[in-house]
């Protein structure tokens, strides 16, 4: 069994439409195509082991297929912030292709060389019961960010569960509509020589997101191109 070691190893954790195998295959094709175009080598897919018995009736009924793909960039010198920037743009390209094909039930929880997002519609104390990986003693991390949030102004769903890719936030943003409209205006002026094509990053705020998910979208835009931190 090969051991894949190194900070340049990347993992994409995602939700796929569980009961539509044709859509699943389309999702996988889009992911592999965009990763290859971005000069990544794919090691393979992995079905994330889960225990659905800990879920409630609605959560189980709407439960997605959860899959990871392991991959690595072919440029060994690409690492750290530069690699994360490349991953950010690649994720946006994948998401935009999925929108073009009207794929529902597809959501990228994380695409990173630094972090993996585990999320879902279950009680906080059930996270390691549902995600069996978290029971494995070989599964280690320098730190973990945990957040529990009950949906108030949007219908609960797997993709809108906390945490998001950059933040864990309670939402309740009263200026959400205005901020969203202003972001749309600012998109027209966006420019950067750090990305392959700035159009790949638009729309910054993805359609159908909650207020905290929209904030996450914007945080990633501002932190991915530069050494800025969120604070």
Language-model features: locations:
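A short, surface-exposed, charged and often Trp/Pro-enriched helix-loop connector in the C-terminal portion
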Residues: 20-29, 33-59, 64
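Single conserved hydrophobic/aromatic residue that forms the stacking wall/gate
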Residues: 1-6, 222-231
